[in-house]
């Protein structure tokens, strides 16, 4: 392998490693400067709330809120309202997209209270009113809040809005100016090398763990460790070629890995992610390893999932996380690749023990799902500890309103005497048990089931083709 080829290979490695930081902070920048999707521009340390008509695509079981966090001026105090038995999660994600802490129904917090969010290395005085200190690995982070909600039920939506009104973020001491935005890098850097300039600047501003900093040393020859003026203004032809080739190769590697995680027997439309912007939610519960086999990609009934896609945080696992082998990728290089895939398909998604999504394109007989037919899904007891939500999407996914989801909170849901829930998936509503009806589009579709803290060993059966009514 020649010198130029080795440099391009190294750049591909750096692209995979740095993509989560760049993609995550670019999205933070979009939210704070221009708005994100239906959310308006939202300053650091303030909340942006999705509404039922404009919620995150693919997460019809919850209402989501985002708060970009800036801890550069010191700690923040997060006030959380009592949420009772309703599923709620407050998920903390660092600049490198690592989930580093959780508060909520699973992790404690249903009674509400105050938490202190501290910047890296902070050792100041903790107020007595604070329940717990959450130290962020980076000075900029993201808080993702989800409340279980029946989006078509005005009363339930109003209850969630009332909960949101009880959310608050304020500085522990007198507020400073804080960040007006993220550093954008040297404007003299060539536009084609913008990714590398952002990676260089942001990796310096938001340094990762010690182990990752040691790993970064290998990228010295690419200019990524340079301080001050950009090395990408007029780079040598060899460096420019290596960076451009490496970016293309690294992107292809991420796309191939994303397909392996999301494919279903070689078919599909790219599926959906687990994160806030891309809409996927994910959980599990109980003890480590307590995730439904179907959520781990088991083939029963064609259900596929990625409960362990978000197991890439190896260095900073704070309150509410599970620091156990089943939830840690043993190989650091594999962790970097999973992190890049997660940033690509499900930015800011949670660990599989906090929630999980599983989907299928086929029925129990192995036939492709099609809206010309009707199907039943029997969810046996015990149900997931904190709920579930089922919806159907056309393949390929079509623009338009999000489909109606049926969840454990749907008013009028009919249960069998033993607690089993029988759901009917069809294009036309059934004559009875209308609350148990999951509408499906005409033509090919996929069914998506979200499980909020499922019990250990909970298995999702296949969809069975039903007789027309």
What residues fall within each predicted segment?
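A compositional/structural signature for long, glycine/proline-rich flexible linkers
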Residues: 1-268, 279, 284-469
């Amino acid at each position: 392998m020649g010198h130029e080829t080795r440099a391009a290979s190294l750049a591909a490695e750096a692209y995979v490693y740095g993509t989560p930081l760049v993609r995550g902070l670019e999205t933070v920048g979009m939210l704070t400067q221009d708005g994100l999707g239906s959310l308006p521009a939202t300053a650091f340390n303030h909340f942006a709330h999705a509404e039922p008509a404009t919620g995150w695509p693919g997460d019809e079981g919850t209402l989501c809120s985002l708060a970009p966090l800036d801890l550069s001026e010191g700690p923040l105090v997060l006030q959380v309202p009592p949420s009772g038995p309703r599923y709620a999660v407050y998920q903390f994600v660092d600049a490198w997209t690592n989930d580093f802490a959780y508060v909520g129904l699973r992790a404690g917090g249903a009674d509400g209270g105050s938490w202190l969010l501290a910047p890296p290395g902070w050792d100041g005085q903790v107020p007595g009113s604070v329940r717990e200190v959450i130290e962020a690995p980076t000075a900029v982070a993201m808080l993702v809040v989800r409340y279980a909600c029946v989006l078509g039920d005005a009363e339930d939506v109003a209850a969630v809005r009332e909960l949101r009104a009880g959310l608050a973020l304020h500085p522990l001491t007198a507020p400073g100016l804080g960040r007006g935005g993220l550093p954008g890098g040297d404007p003299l850097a060539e536009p084609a090398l913008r990714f590398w300039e952002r990676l260089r600047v942001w990796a310096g501003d938001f340094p990762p763990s010690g182990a990752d900093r040691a790993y970064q040393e290998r990228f010295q020859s690419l200019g990524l460790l340079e301080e001050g003026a950009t090395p990408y203004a007029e780079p040598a032809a060899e460096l420019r070629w290596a960076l451009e080739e490496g970016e293309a190769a690294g992107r292809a590697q991420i796309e191939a890995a994303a397909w392996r995680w999301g494919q279903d027997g070689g078919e599909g439309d790219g599926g959906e992610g687990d994160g806030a912007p891309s809409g996927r939610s994910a959980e599990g519960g109980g003890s480590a390893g307590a995730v439904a086999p179907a959520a781990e990609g088991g083939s029963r009934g064609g259900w596929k999932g990625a409960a362990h896609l978000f197991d890439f945080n190896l260095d900073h696992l704070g309150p509410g996380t599970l620091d156990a082998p089943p939830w840690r990728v043993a190989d650091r290089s594999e962790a970097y690749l999973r992190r890049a895939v997660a940033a690509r398909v499900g930015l800011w998604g949670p660990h599989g023990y906090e929630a999980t999504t599983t989907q299928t394109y086929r029925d129990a007989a192995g036939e492709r799902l099609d809206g010309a037919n009707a199907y039943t899904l029997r969810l046996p007891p015990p149900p997931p500890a904190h709920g579930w939500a089922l919806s159907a999407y056309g393949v390929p996914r079509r623009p338009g309103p999000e489909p109606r989801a049926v969840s454990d909170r749907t008013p009028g849901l009919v249960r069998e005497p033993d607690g089993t829930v029988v759901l009917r998936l069809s294009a036309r509503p059934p004559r009875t048990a209308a609350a148990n009806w999951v509408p499906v589009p005409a033509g090919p579709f996929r069914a998506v089931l979200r499980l909020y803290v499922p019990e250990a060993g909970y298995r999702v059966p296949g969809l069975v083709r039903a007789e027309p009514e």
